[in-house]
Regions:
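Boundary/entry segment of secreted carbohydrate-active catalytic domains
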Residues: 2-62, 370
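Hydrophobic faces of well-ordered beta-strands that scaffold small-molecule active sites
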Residues: 32-36, 59-63, 81-85, 120-124, ...
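Short, acidic/polar
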Residues: 37-52, 98-112, 189-193, 303, ...
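Acidic-and-aromatic substrate-binding clefts and catalytic sites of carbohydrate-active enzymes
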Residues: 40-44, 59-72, 89-100, 130-131, ...
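Substrate-binding and catalytic surfaces of secreted/luminal carbohydrate-active proteins
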Residues: 50, 146-150, 157-165, 172, ...
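Generic structural signal for hydrophobic
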Residues: 52-53, 73-74, 111-114, 199, ...
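Substrate-binding cleft of extracellular glycoside hydrolase catalytic domains
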Residues: 70-171, 177-187, 275
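Cleavable C-terminal sorting propeptides in eukaryotic secreted/cell-surface proteins
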Residues: 470-494
Length: 494
């Protein structure tokens, strides 16, 4: 997801309130929008990513920060851009109009004037009112929005670039489970009203993130069918919610309309609501797989293509799919699935078939260069019980992505030797296949025989030209979540 916040415990309202936002605005059905995250050890080159977007009909892209390479690549492409101001800058921007003006100059004005980037909006913060933040950004968010708006006006961009705040669905709730009873969370009700009023008065819009997958992840008793969009003509699931004359057959509609009811209740129903993130991961959890992701996202694209909205907002909103690509350097604090939200793999290959706008099929990235066809695996004569292996595997997974080894994941059924080989290879590929990255106490060897098996794919990393990269300097230190992931694996090799 956009933020690293841990998944929140859900009350009864989880069935209607645990979704991430989709952009709601009139647009032709052939127009699609996607989140382009860049937290990867080997990011797909900007020009390749832009070509991938255009080949598949995406004409809007959302960036979580003003990534220079991504923004330059988006110049003169016709793709409309939402650029993010990260949470860590909220306090400084809130406290100084000058800081806001400097940020706008460096990250908005310059890219519009020098590179021809079609920046249409600035996302101030990302889910700043999450309960898990315990109010950390509440005082700074609205002043930051006001200062960024003032900076855009001063730069002559007040009509061209609009301000928004992407919010998590935990900012509103329904105490009895009916969308019509929706209201803002009591502790931030006044803040939400003031924020939305400012956005409405200044031509901005509201962005909401909705994740049906998280409803299922957070509650083992959540009705599975309610997480998906029902197929046309199919009977409603038993979990459907009756709200007066309206029957809600899926959690997205119920969640979105809970927000709309909250806005209407406070006289703010005129605000445009954009869904900033919605999607389904393909790995890292028993419910995160390609089949489930294909089912959910195809239902989503079918809704977009049909222009079908929700009972309270019949016109389908703009939807920023989360995400375009996998990101192997993201925090896994929310869960091991966090690195696997992409519709495309890290290299731009589709994970599953999809019918996009106008019935077109999903297309892979073009012009991707790969490293040599070789892998690092456990040496055949090495014993899995070698005492040096636990430390070697732990080190490999500290600096590379081993989330696919978790229970219920794509590589969760490997035997001990293959588990170790997978960890070794992930580190080897992340280090650009440097020979010394396959030197685990003489327990590993480089092979040209593909060790992939079943659903578990042993990667060959894309070639970014950065052959002096060392993984230890490029990856974040091991988190508690990573350590917990490794415990079952390490127990096998101790």
């Amino acid at each position: 997801m956009g933020s690293c916040a841990a998944v929140r415990a859900m009350r009864a309202v989880v069935w209607v309130a645990a979704l991430y936002p989709v952009l709601f605005r009139a647009r032709p059905v052939e127009a699609l929008a996607a989140n382009w995250g860049t937290r990867a050890l080997h990011p797909l080159p900007g020009d390749v990513t832009v070509r991938l977007l255009r080949d598949n009909g995406f004409d809007k892209a959302k960036l979580f920060e003003a990534d220079p390479a991504a923004l330059r690549a988006l110049g003169h492409t016709g793709i409309q851009v939402m650029v993010g101001l990260p949470n860590e800058l909220l306090v400084s921007v809130a406290g100084s109009v000058g800081a806001a003006e400097q940020w706008v100059l460096q990250n908005v004005s310059s890219y519009i004037s020098k590179y021809g980037v079609d920046i249409r909006s600035v996302a101030v913060g990302n889910e700043p009112f999450l309960k898990s933040y315990k109010g950390k950004f509440e005082a700074a968010t609205l002043p930051a929005v006001q200062n960024v708006q003032a900076a855009l006006v001063k730069a002559g961009l007040g009509r061209q670039v609009h301000v928004t705040v992407p919010l998590n669905a935990d900012v509103y709730e329904s105490l009895d489970g009916r969308p019509s009873a929706g209201d803002f969370r009591p502790d931030i009700q006044g803040l939400m009203v003031n924020l939305v009023r400012f956005l409405l008065d200044n031509g901005g819009f509201l962005t909401i993130n909705i994740y049906p997958f998280l409803s299922l992840y957070a509650d083992p008793n959540f009705p599975v069918e309610y997480a998906y969009f029902p197929a046309p003509g199919s009977p409603p699931s038993q979990a459907s919610v009756q709200d007066g004359n309206v029957l809600y057959t899926n959690v997205f509609d119920a969640n979105y309309d809970t927000l709309i009811a909250a806005l209407d209740k406070h006289g703010l129903g005129a605000i445009t609501v954009v869904v900033g993130e919605i999607g389904w991961p393909t790995d890292g959890d028993k419910n995160a797989n390609a089949a489930n992701a294909q089912r959910f996202n195809q239902g989503l694209f079918d809704r977009i293509n049909a222009g079908k909205g929700t009972p309270r907002r019949p016109q389908m909103p703009d939807v920023y799919v989360f995400a375009l690509l996998d990101e192997d350097a993201k925090s896994i604090e929310p869960g091991n699935f966090e690195r696997h939200w992409g519709v495309f793999n890290y290299d731009g290959t589709p994970k599953y078939g999809l019918r996009l706008a106008n019935g077109r099929s999903i297309l892979p990235a073009r012009g991707v260069r790969y490293l040599s066809r070789q892998w690092c695996v456990l040496r055949p004569e090495a014993s899995p019980s070698d005492p040096a292996l636990a430390g070697a595997v732990g080190y490999a997974c500290q600096y590379a992505d081993c989330t696919s080894l978790g229970a219920g994941s794509s590589c969760g059924n490997l035997d001990v030797r293959s588990n170790i080989s997978y960890a070794f290879n992930q580190y080897f590929q992340s280090a650009n296949q440097q020979k010394n990255a396959c030197a685990f106490n003489n327990l590993s060897v480089i092979t040209t025989t593909d060790p992939s098996q079943g659903t578990c794919h042993f990667e060959i990393m894309i070639d970014t030209g950065r052959h002096d990269l060392t993984v230890a300097s490029a990856a974040a230190a091991m988190t508690v979540a990573t350590a917990l992931l490794l415990l079952p694996l390490l127990s096998l090799v101790i």
